[in-house]
Design a protein with these regions (language model features):
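Extracytosolic ligand-binding ectodomains
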Residues: 1-145
Length: 145
């Protein structure tokens, strides 16, 4: 694999990627790595499609949620590779319980961000349980536990 183009953008310029896409296409890039969040990624996929440019897109966990991005045609994400630490399809019992409870409460399948928040709170819960923290303890007692 050879890197043929490297491009960047700023927060202020994340609504128009035509220059970067044109440069990547002109350089012959047949794969584009997107280590970004899903909102700018949805714009990139939309603009690439509009210009007829169809490289393979490879993203990371920040792109989890792209299918629910506002005003995004989710069909454009078909074939995008995504590396993420969470899969709602996991057969793990704890994951399936989380997915079911999340879906009941919010009416949608959770993405990696919801799973990360759950993991953070569950880790705190486990630490509190292991330390024997109770509601009547002072801040100092909790810290010492």
């Amino acid at each position: 694999m050879e890197i043929v183009y490297e491009g960047t953008f700023t927060e202020a310029s994340q609504t128009d990627f035509n220059n970067q896409l044109t440069a990547a296409q002109s350089a012959g890039a047949d794969m584009i790595f997107l280590p970004i969040y899903y909102t700018p990624a949805s714009v990139i996929l939309t603009q690439a499609n509009a210009m007829g440019y169809a490289p393979t897109f490879f993203g990371v966990d920040g792109m989890d949620g792209i299918l629910t991005a506002e005003n995004f045609d989710a069909s454009l994400a078909e074939g995008v590779y995504l590396l993420t630490p969470f899969s709602a399809d996991s057969e793990d019992e704890m994951t399936q319980n989380f997915v079911a409870e999340y879906q009941d409460r919010f009416g949608e399948i959770p993405n990696q961000f919801g799973a990360d928040a759950y993991d953070a709170i569950y880790t705190l819960y486990q630490a509190i349980q292991a330390a024997g923290v109770t509601a009547d303890m002072s801040n100092e007692e909790i810290c010492d536990a």
